[in-house]
Amino acid sequence: MSSAIERKSLDPSEEPVDEVLQIPPSLLTCGGCQQNIGDRYFLKAIDQYWHEDCLSCDLCGCRLGEVGRRLYYKLGRKLCRRDYLRLFGQDGLCASCDKRIRAYEMTMRVKDKVYHLECFKCAACQKHFCVGDRYLLINSDIVCEQDIYEWTKINGMI
């Protein structure tokens, strides 16, 4: 389960009453260290408020309040994406090398086939594909546009 993290800001010279909270931000207690939040910036996640440094992954300790980070909350644990997938994601096998693909690894997917990034290359010339490159999927083999005729001829398909 993924949770959104809200970034809040307040001007230290004036302490407005939060429209949702109906209490001044300086009276907020951090969900991590249990201290008052007097910082200009703070976070809201899992129905609690946090200092930026206190909202971290329970396993690896990485900061979860950084831009672009997602917070996963399961079984009472705050987790980064990598640790969430490591604990709860499903591993699979690469269609090219038949070796294990860990749930947190970056992959390429074509139809129902999944490949390690380093395995996603032309079976004939071994060239790695770039965005926009054209290829053909033949069984589990990926063949670049330039090698399709030769590949099918060698493998008795024409």
From Swiss-Prot:
Its main location: nucleus. Signal peptide: none annotated. It holds the Pfam family LIM. It comes from the Eukaryota. Acts with TAL1/SCL to regulate red blood cell development. Also acts with LDB1 to maintain erythroid precursors in an immature state. It is linked to A chromosomal aberration involving LMO2 may be a cause of a form of T-cell acute lymphoblastic leukemia (T-ALL). Translocation t(11,14)(p13;q11) with TCRD. Interacts via its LIM domains with ELF2 and LDB1. Also interacts with basic helix-loop-helix protein TAL1/SCL and can assemble in a complex with LMO2 and TAL1/SCL. Interacts with BEX2 and KDM5A. This is Rhombotin-2. It comes from Homo sapiens (Human).
